[in-house]
Amino acid sequence: MLTQLKKVGTEVHRATNLFATYVGKNKVKCPGDVKKFIFLCGANKNNGEPSARRIELIDFSEKHLSNCHFFLAELVFKELSKDEEDSSSDNLLDIEADLSKLADHIIIVLESFSSFTELGAFAYSKQLRKKLIIINNTKFINEKSFINMGPIKAITQQSQQSGYFLHYKMAEGNESIERSDGIGQIFNPLYDILSRNDRAIARTLKKEDLDPSNNFNKDSVRFIHDIILACGPLKLNELIEIAIKIFGKDSFYRKELLKHLGILMAIKIISCKDDFYYSLYKQYYFK
C-alpha cells in the first residue's frame, strides 16, 4: 500500500492528493445531521466484559437510537495498548477525560465503586455536568448521602434539567452486574433525551480543525474514518504516511491516530483484521 501511495497514478495516490487539496483549501464540508457520540460508563463483569446493564443499553441504542454512537472507554484503551513504543504513558483516567470532552452525552450507570468515582470526576467539571445522564437506584433518590449532596446536587444546580437523572429499582450485589435486571424501565425517558437532534448548520472545516495530532474531537474522528473508507484497508503505518502527506511532517501521529482508531472501533464503524483497518460504515461523513 505504501508503494501505491507514493506511485503517481494509483487510486490511493489520487485519493490522498484529493484529500490533501480539499483540506489545504479549507473545503471540507460537514453536514448538520451527524450522529451524536454517547460515552457509556459503568461496571464490568468478572470476565472483563461490560456489565449486563451496559450491554442492554448498547443493544437498545442499536435498535432505537439510530442518531447515536454509543462507545466504551475500555475499547479505546485496548487500541492504545497496541502502541508498544509508548504504552507506559497511557492511563484510563486520561483517556476518559479526552473521551468526555468528545462526547455529546455521558451516561453513568451507578453500579460499582468505579462508576461513583467517574461521577465525582465528571461532576467536578462545570463544562461536563450538562452532558451527564445518571442512572441510579430509586431507593437512593432522597438519601442524604455524599453522592446526592455532592456531585448530583452540583449537576442539578448547573443544568436545572431533572431529565438527566433516571431512576429505577436496581438489583443489588455482584449478580446485578453479571445478569440483567429491570433497566428497561428507563429506556423511554432515555429515548426522549437522546432522540432529540439539535440540528446544526452545515459547516466548512479548516485544515487545523482536522489534524489528528492536534485534535481529538468528532470532526477529526470522522475525517480519519473517511480516509480509511477512501484509501483502505490501511495499516497504521500507512495511515500515518497519509496523515503526513495531508498535514505535514512536523507532528507525531502514531499515538493520536491509535486513539482515533480506538473510538472508531468502539462505535463499530471500522474494524481491523490482520492489522488492516477497514470501514464498516460504507459512506462518507464529509462532503
Where are these regions (language model features)?
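Conserved catalytic or regulatory cores that recognize and/or transform ribose-phosphate-containing ligands
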Residues: 1-119, 124-287
